[in-house]
Amino acid sequence: MHYSEEDIENLEKVFRINLINSCSGYKSANLIGSTSKTGINNLAIFSSITHLGSNPPLLGFFLRPTEIVPRHTYLNIKDNPYYTINSVQSEFVDKAHHTSAKYDREVSEFDITKIEPEYINNFPAPFVKSSSVKIGMKFVEEIKINYNKSRLIVGKIVELNIDDHLISVDGFINLSDAEVATISGCDGYSFPASNSRKGYQKPQKS
Protein backbone atom coordinates (compact mmCIF):
# COMPACT_ATOMS: atom_id res chain seq x y z
CA MET A 1 0.00 0.00 0.00
CA HIS A 2 1.40 3.37 -1.02
CA TYR A 3 0.49 6.60 0.78
CA SER A 4 1.53 9.95 -0.66
CA GLU A 5 1.89 13.06 1.47
CA GLU A 6 -1.56 14.14 0.31
CA ASP A 7 -3.01 10.71 1.10
CA ILE A 8 -1.65 10.86 4.64
CA GLU A 9 -3.05 14.34 5.23
CA ASN A 10 -6.51 13.18 4.11
CA LEU A 11 -6.66 9.95 6.12
CA GLU A 12 -9.38 9.46 8.70
CA LYS A 13 -8.04 10.71 12.05
CA VAL A 14 -7.89 7.45 14.04
CA PHE A 15 -6.51 5.50 11.07
CA ARG A 16 -3.79 8.11 10.57
CA ILE A 17 -2.87 8.07 14.26
CA ASN A 18 -2.52 4.28 14.27
CA LEU A 19 -0.64 4.19 10.97
CA ILE A 20 1.91 6.86 11.83
CA ASN A 21 2.39 5.63 15.40
CA SER A 22 3.21 2.09 14.27
CA CYS A 23 5.18 2.63 11.03
CA SER A 24 8.51 3.28 12.81
CA GLY A 25 8.49 -0.07 14.63
CA TYR A 26 8.51 -1.21 18.22
CA LYS A 27 9.07 1.31 21.02
CA SER A 28 9.79 0.89 24.71
CA ALA A 29 6.84 0.87 27.10
CA ASN A 30 7.53 2.72 30.33
CA LEU A 31 5.61 4.17 33.23
CA ILE A 32 6.66 7.63 34.40
CA GLY A 33 5.99 8.35 38.06
CA SER A 34 5.82 11.92 39.34
CA THR A 35 4.44 13.90 42.26
CA SER A 36 2.51 17.17 42.24
CA LYS A 37 3.28 20.05 44.59
CA THR A 38 0.21 19.00 46.61
CA GLY A 39 1.58 15.48 47.04
CA ILE A 40 -0.58 13.63 44.50
CA ASN A 41 1.29 10.82 42.74
CA ASN A 42 0.83 10.58 38.98
CA LEU A 43 1.58 7.54 36.82
CA ALA A 44 1.43 7.59 33.02
CA ILE A 45 2.52 5.24 30.27
CA PHE A 46 4.89 6.55 27.60
CA SER A 47 6.25 5.04 24.39
CA SER A 48 8.55 7.92 23.46
CA ILE A 49 11.45 7.52 25.90
CA THR A 50 14.82 7.57 24.15
CA HIS A 51 18.49 7.29 25.08
CA LEU A 52 20.36 10.59 24.66
CA GLY A 53 23.79 9.71 26.01
CA SER A 54 25.66 7.64 28.59
CA ASN A 55 28.12 10.22 29.93
CA PRO A 56 26.33 12.13 31.32
CA PRO A 57 23.52 9.53 31.44
CA LEU A 58 20.55 11.21 29.77
CA LEU A 59 17.11 10.02 28.73
CA GLY A 60 14.46 12.05 26.95
CA PHE A 61 10.77 11.69 26.28
CA PHE A 62 8.39 13.58 24.05
CA LEU A 63 5.20 15.36 25.04
CA ARG A 64 2.40 16.41 22.75
CA PRO A 65 1.44 20.12 22.86
CA THR A 66 0.85 21.18 26.44
CA GLU A 67 -1.17 24.23 25.43
CA ILE A 68 -4.14 22.14 24.24
CA VAL A 69 -4.47 19.29 26.76
CA PRO A 70 -3.11 19.43 30.34
CA ARG A 71 -0.12 17.11 30.71
CA HIS A 72 0.01 16.15 34.37
CA THR A 73 3.44 14.53 34.11
CA TYR A 74 4.83 17.75 32.63
CA LEU A 75 3.19 19.96 35.25
CA ASN A 76 4.50 17.77 38.05
CA ILE A 77 8.06 17.77 36.71
CA LYS A 78 7.97 21.56 36.48
CA ASP A 79 6.97 21.66 40.16
CA ASN A 80 9.24 18.81 41.32
CA PRO A 81 12.22 18.08 39.03
CA TYR A 82 12.51 14.45 40.16
CA TYR A 83 10.57 11.67 38.45
CA THR A 84 10.91 7.96 37.73
CA ILE A 85 10.91 5.77 34.65
CA ASN A 86 9.76 2.18 35.19
CA SER A 87 9.62 -0.90 32.98
CA VAL A 88 6.31 -2.59 32.18
CA GLN A 89 6.06 -6.36 32.60
CA SER A 90 3.52 -8.78 31.18
CA GLU A 91 1.81 -9.37 34.53
CA PHE A 92 0.61 -5.78 34.87
CA VAL A 93 0.45 -4.53 31.28
CA ASP A 94 -3.35 -4.06 31.44
CA LYS A 95 -3.05 -1.87 34.52
CA ALA A 96 -0.17 0.04 32.93
CA HIS A 97 -2.17 0.70 29.76
CA HIS A 98 -5.07 2.10 31.80
CA THR A 99 -2.83 4.94 33.01
CA SER A 100 -3.37 6.45 29.53
CA ALA A 101 -6.93 7.33 30.60
CA LYS A 102 -7.39 11.05 31.23
CA TYR A 103 -8.12 11.41 34.93
CA ASP A 104 -8.23 14.73 36.78
CA ARG A 105 -4.90 15.87 38.20
CA GLU A 106 -5.99 15.28 41.79
CA VAL A 107 -6.63 11.58 41.03
CA SER A 108 -3.67 9.23 41.43
CA GLU A 109 -3.32 6.53 38.77
CA PHE A 110 -1.49 4.44 41.37
CA ASP A 111 -4.74 4.31 43.37
CA ILE A 112 -7.00 3.75 40.36
CA THR A 113 -4.96 0.91 38.85
CA LYS A 114 -3.81 -0.64 42.15
CA ILE A 115 -0.22 -0.44 40.92
CA GLU A 116 1.85 -0.27 44.10
CA PRO A 117 4.27 2.65 44.47
CA GLU A 118 7.68 2.17 46.04
CA TYR A 119 9.98 4.72 47.65
CA ILE A 120 13.70 3.91 47.48
CA ASN A 121 16.53 5.73 49.27
CA ASN A 122 14.30 8.73 50.03
CA PHE A 123 14.01 9.51 46.32
CA PRO A 124 11.38 12.28 46.00
CA ALA A 125 9.19 10.53 43.41
CA PRO A 126 7.46 7.13 43.40
CA PHE A 127 8.82 4.07 41.62
CA VAL A 128 6.66 1.15 40.49
CA LYS A 129 7.30 -1.70 42.91
CA SER A 130 6.59 -4.47 40.37
CA SER A 131 8.97 -3.09 37.73
CA SER A 132 12.24 -4.92 37.11
CA VAL A 133 13.98 -1.74 35.95
CA LYS A 134 13.43 1.43 37.97
CA ILE A 135 15.19 4.65 36.95
CA GLY A 136 15.41 7.77 39.10
CA MET A 137 15.52 10.92 36.97
CA LYS A 138 16.18 14.63 37.45
CA PHE A 139 14.88 17.18 34.96
CA VAL A 140 17.62 18.95 32.97
CA GLU A 141 15.92 20.94 30.22
CA GLU A 142 13.07 21.02 27.73
CA ILE A 143 13.32 21.64 24.02
CA LYS A 144 10.27 22.88 22.15
CA ILE A 145 9.71 21.54 18.65
CA ASN A 146 8.16 24.52 16.91
CA TYR A 147 6.83 22.61 13.91
CA ASN A 148 4.13 20.82 15.93
CA LYS A 149 4.60 22.39 19.40
CA SER A 150 5.71 19.11 20.98
CA ARG A 151 8.39 19.14 23.66
CA LEU A 152 11.43 16.99 24.33
CA ILE A 153 11.90 16.61 28.07
CA VAL A 154 15.52 15.82 28.94
CA GLY A 155 16.49 14.26 32.24
CA LYS A 156 19.61 12.88 33.90
CA ILE A 157 19.69 9.40 35.42
CA VAL A 158 20.56 9.85 39.09
CA GLU A 159 19.59 6.40 40.38
CA LEU A 160 19.18 2.90 38.92
CA ASN A 161 17.43 -0.07 40.52
CA ILE A 162 17.58 -3.25 38.44
CA ASP A 163 16.83 -6.87 39.32
CA ASP A 164 20.25 -8.48 39.82
CA HIS A 165 19.70 -11.48 37.54
CA LEU A 166 19.02 -9.25 34.52
CA ILE A 167 22.46 -7.60 34.45
CA SER A 168 25.16 -9.26 32.33
CA VAL A 169 28.87 -9.04 33.17
CA ASP A 170 29.31 -6.30 30.54
CA GLY A 171 26.39 -4.21 31.83
CA PHE A 172 23.81 -5.37 29.26
CA ILE A 173 20.30 -5.64 30.74
CA ASN A 174 18.46 -8.75 29.55
CA LEU A 175 14.94 -7.35 29.34
CA SER A 176 13.58 -10.51 27.71
CA ASP A 177 14.10 -12.48 30.92
CA ALA A 178 11.78 -10.05 32.71
CA GLU A 179 9.11 -10.12 29.98
CA VAL A 180 9.44 -6.37 29.52
CA ALA A 181 6.85 -4.93 27.14
CA THR A 182 7.26 -2.98 23.94
CA ILE A 183 4.59 -0.93 22.16
CA SER A 184 3.63 -0.81 18.51
CA GLY A 185 1.32 2.05 17.65
CA CYS A 186 -0.74 3.34 20.56
CA ASP A 187 -2.02 0.09 22.02
CA GLY A 188 -0.21 -2.95 20.57
CA TYR A 189 1.94 -4.63 23.23
CA SER A 190 4.61 -7.23 22.48
CA PHE A 191 7.09 -9.13 24.63
CA PRO A 192 10.42 -9.93 22.94
CA ALA A 193 11.38 -13.52 23.66
CA SER A 194 15.11 -13.53 22.95
CA ASN A 195 18.18 -11.42 22.25
CA SER A 196 20.59 -11.56 19.34
CA ARG A 197 23.64 -9.55 20.33
CA LYS A 198 26.23 -8.55 17.76
CA GLY A 199 29.83 -7.51 18.32
CA TYR A 200 31.19 -3.99 17.99
CA GLN A 201 31.70 -3.34 14.28
CA LYS A 202 34.82 -1.95 12.63
CA PRO A 203 35.38 -1.15 8.95
CA GLN A 204 36.40 -4.20 6.92
CA LYS A 205 39.91 -4.22 5.54
CA SER A 206 40.05 -4.34 1.76
Regions found by a protein language model. Give the residues of each.
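Basic, polyanion-binding surface patches
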Residues: 1-206
